Amino acid sequence: MIVTDKISDVRNIIKEQKLSGKKIGLVPTMGYLHEGHLSLVRIAKKHSDFVAVSIFVNPIQFGPNEDFDRYPRDLERDLKLLEKEGCDLVFAPSVEEMYPSELLTTVNVDKITEKLCGAFRPGHFKGVTTVVAKLFNIFTPDIAVFGQKDAQQVAVIKKMVEDLNFPVEIIKAPIVRESDGLAMSSRNVYLNPEERKAALILSKSLKEAEKLLLNGERNANTIIKKVNEVLNSEPLCKVQYVSCVHPDTLEDLTYIKDKALIAIACFIGTTRLIDNLLWGENI
């Protein structure tokens, strides 16, 4: 496994691999890897011949009062995990390497970034699309794998790729959960034992939504109401939003015809957690 913090190294390595006919797979991460991230690496391995992982806590996607400084980091541990998975290349740049001078060019996807998480984290998705566009230009991957837990991020990146003709296929990977149902997240480390228990309310509320859907309920408001009810039954849970949208366009749904995404964001104590249920689409 090659590890580098230099863009020029990545370019040379990828060029070599492409010349020998290899298909390049990219898994962009912010590090502090968990089983969810590792599942993305496994999916990338299935769809490509050379798997690259980027580890970069991207400052421009954090708001002024968000957790950039305390976001968990452990590169040594991450590298051990990736080595075990048979990853080929790890790119772990410094902020200076990625943003050597004042950043005057950004990539912004309109409209679908203004709802769900975007409504509460202004500028967040602009930071995401800008860094992902940079990574796509650095790696020129054939495929890139993103987790369904960040459902809005996947939709936004897919739109950017479509609109700007990036020659990369975006593969969506299913949410990986702890044995008790909590969606895996690097931010789960912030939860104390009491909050960790309370956080199960997110997946419980989505289970209730799924039950309604399986029983034939198609009215989005009925489902949203039920999810809110379950979430509000947990005193430590402060709901930020519950939405029922189309998974590709993120348009609000009133009636569920085929595909739907039930997306939620809550604070458990001071930790913001997101989760979702994808209905009518197999990934």
Swiss-Prot record:
Enzyme nomenclature, EC number: 6.3.2.1
Gene Ontology MF terms in the entry: ATP binding; pantoate-beta-alanine ligase activity
Pathway: Cofactor biosynthesis; (R)-pantothenate biosynthesis; (R)-pantothenate from (R)-pantoate and beta-alanine: step 1/1
Protein residues bound to (R)-pantoate: 61, 153
Top-rank taxon, per record: Bacteria
A single GO BP: pantothenate biosynthetic process
InterPro entries according to UniProt: Cyt_trans-like (IPR004821), Pantoate_ligase (IPR003721), Pantoate_ligase_C (IPR042176), Rossmann-like_a/b/a_fold (IPR014729)
Enzyme class: ligase
Nucleotide-binding listed as a keyword: yes
Tagged with keyword Metal-binding: no
Residues annotated for ATP binding in this entry: 30-37, 147-150, 176, 184-187
Substrates-to-products reaction catalysed: (R)-pantoate + beta-alanine + ATP = (R)-pantothenate + AMP + diphosphate + H(+)
Positions bound to beta-alanine: 61
Subcellular compartments: Cytoplasm
Keywords, sorted A to Z: ATP-binding, Cytoplasm, Ligase, Nucleotide-binding, Pantothenate biosynthesis
Signal peptide span: none
Catalytic residue list: 37
Assigned protein family: Belongs to the pantothenate synthetase family.
Assembly and interaction partners: Homodimer.
Other information: The reaction proceeds by a bi uni uni bi ping pong mechanism.
Function text: Catalyzes the condensation of pantoate with beta-alanine in an ATP-dependent reaction via a pantoyl-adenylate intermediate.
UniProt-recorded name of the protein: Pantothenate synthetase
Naturally occurring in which organism (per UniProt): Thermoanaerobacter sp. (strain X514)
Gene responsible for this protein: panC
